[in-house]
Amino acid sequence: RSVSIALINRGPAKTVTVDCSTWRTRTDGTPSLHQPLRRIVYEAANPPLNAFNDLQAASGTVTATGGVFTVALPAKSMTFLTTDYIDRTPPAVGGVELKGGVLSWTASTGPAHVYYRVYRDGVQIASTVATRLDVKGAKGDYAVRSVDRWNNVGR
């Protein structure tokens, strides 16, 4: 079982303390916060945009101590907290090959694979669910990384 909550702050930056001492799973009564909450922040003044519409990276975790946790909320923001994640590195993508202006690779067999991020010379150039990409013959050092459902990026 997992816990996910959204904290919306419509005013100036502040810190809030949340009492989670009574949160229990529905089945066996054990505390719901079995691991730290992953923290993702969306700020109105600084929207998380990138050219490829990738999910934004988490901005750390929050751990409950003594049945409470404290979270800093930026001004005019939404902070999303969840235990629904696995912190891991997806498997490396193999078979990356550039031939005739087309970059191709072997499909990921990772259990929670969602899409790929493609890099040329260390700079992201695309996000795709496909296993090939027309790069118009652009030379460079290419890398393809698997991204899983928890937004973990492979090596």
Which residues does each PLM region occupy?
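Short strand-edge motifs at loop-to-beta-strand transitions and within beta-strands
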Residues: 67-69, 79, 131-133
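Carbohydrate-binding surface patches
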Residues: 1-42, 76-80, 110-111, 151
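Short beta-strand segments within Ig-like beta-sandwich modules, predominantly Fibronectin type-III
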Residues: 123-130
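Extracellular Ig-like/FN3 beta-sandwich strand-entry sites
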Residues: 78, 113, 139-141
